[in-house]
Amino acid sequence: MLIDWILKNIMDMDQEDQSGKTQWTKYYLTVYFSGLFNFLMILILSVLFGTLSETFIVYVVLIFLRPVAGGWHAKTKWLCRLESIVIYVAIPFVLKNSSVSLPFIYKILLICLLVVLFYWYAPQGTAIEPVQPSDLNVLKKQSLIRVCLLILCSLFVKEKIASVILYGLVIQGLMILPVTKNLIEGSVFMKFGKKIIKNVIEKRVAKVSDGVGTKPRLNQNSPNIFGQWMGQTEKPKKNIEK
């Protein structure tokens, strides 16, 4: 692993050392390289899909707001990468190739809603990065100032760019809403994904066990979709009790 190699050969640290300095160095390197990987992945995808300018604008908006407004984080690296692709590439791609635009009155309503949302919920801390009570008012003021600056910028640029700026504001707004916490962190996907996978496996196991004691045909009820190329696995001798 690259991080372990750096710790051993560059930082001259023992990987098994549990001291604070070693653990914090490892934590820093893990966060740094994870962020670098995500950045390069998004950069490559934005070039491939032709959304480099839109992706850059969204990235700047979130980098500008997130340090003061806070917000939820995905609980796993893979979910973080998936959400990053959707936020930085997929939706900007749709915005770029869409001819639909919000009427002026709806934009005004959206802007007012965003200001209220940031006033009410920013800054939003997490279990890992809680907001200190002494910093609450300062961060709230900074959040509102930065939101207003971005809104002001959106009034003096082209329609497409303004739409992307507002989109970035909406995304950051969703990241601080309490109702979106489970969605962004991935708890919703984990809950329903676990349930779906469990049901599928249970049905397959029940189907396989029903054929025990009979002469099976080639790959009949095989749990392995690649069974005819990868060989067969011996089935249990007893049926599962119903």
UniProtKB/Swiss-Prot annotation:
SMART domains: AgrB. The chain crosses the membrane at residues 29-49, 52-72, 78-95, 100-120, 160-180. Keywords: Cell membrane, Hydrolase, Membrane, Protease, Quorum sensing, Transmembrane, Transmembrane helix, Virulence. Pfam families: AgrB (PF04647). It is a multi-pass membrane protein. GO terms for molecular function: peptidase activity. Its main location: membrane. One of its GO terms (cellular component) is plasma membrane. It is found in: Cell membrane. GO terms for biological process: proteolysis; quorum sensing. The keyword Transmembrane applies. Belongs to the AgrB family. May be involved in the proteolytic processing of a quorum sensing system signal molecule precursor required for the regulation of the virulence genes for gelatinase (gelE) and a serine protease (sprE). HAMAP family: AgrB. This is Protein FsrB. It comes from Enterococcus faecalis (strain ATCC 47077 / OG1RF).
